[in-house]
Regions:
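Short S/T/G/P-rich N-terminal loop/turn motif that feeds into the first structured element of a domain
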Residues: 1-173
Length: 173
């Protein structure tokens, strides 16, 4: 998710877990048992990127395939901290949820392996399914855009995002 060279990648492996305990249990299982699966995949693992991430919101319900994920590269304005952005985004997500929003949102920070990445963080938005994303998109236009003070506060906190890109996703178990 830190690359501009999408044509050079067959897929992006994105692990989605409800918390760090399950994330690292999944990683342990992969390290101990994933070699056979990796050998069968019709692709070459060209990069491993480690990120720290904080959940802003988690969608209710089950995750179905196919899903939908959006990434945006973001930079902080001078003197603004990631905690300020997170807190404003969290307040906005909670207000949007009261209106019926059910998107998952994360703020992600590259730690290792993201060569050439010159942004401070990523914003990630995802839905449990393609149809759920459609419902949330309609909700955005009908009830949220320009109507929530928390959205205005988020817009004024002091950061900018670019390079919005979206992917479909599928569950692999």
């Amino acid at each position: 998710y830190f690359t501009q060279e999408l044509s050079s990648h067959d897929f992006i492996w994105y692990g989605r877990y409800p918390n760090s305990t399950e994330q690292f249990a999944g990683l342990q299982y992969w390290v101990e048992n994933g070699g056979d699966l990796l050998a069968k995949l019709p692709a070459v693992n060209s990069a491993v990127v480690e990120v720290w991430q904080r959940d802003i919101s988690i969608p209710d319900g089950e995750s179905y395939s196919p899903g939908y994920v959006i990434y945006m590269d973001c930079k902080l304005d001078e003197g603004v901290t990631t905690d300020e952005v997170y807190n404003a985004y969290y307040a906005y997500a909670q207000a949007a949820k009261k209106e019926g929003d059910n998107l998952g949102r994360k703020i992600m920070f590259p730690v290792t392996g993201a060569e050439g990445y010159d942004h401070d963080f990523l914003i990630v938005m995802y839905a449990n399914s393609l149809s759920d994303y459609g419902k949330n998109n309609d909700l955005w236009w009908d009830k949220i855009i320009g109507q929530l003070p928390e959205q205005q506060a988020l817009a004024e906190v002091g950061y900018s995002c670019e390079n919005r890109r979206s992917y479909t996703s599928m569950n692999i178990k």
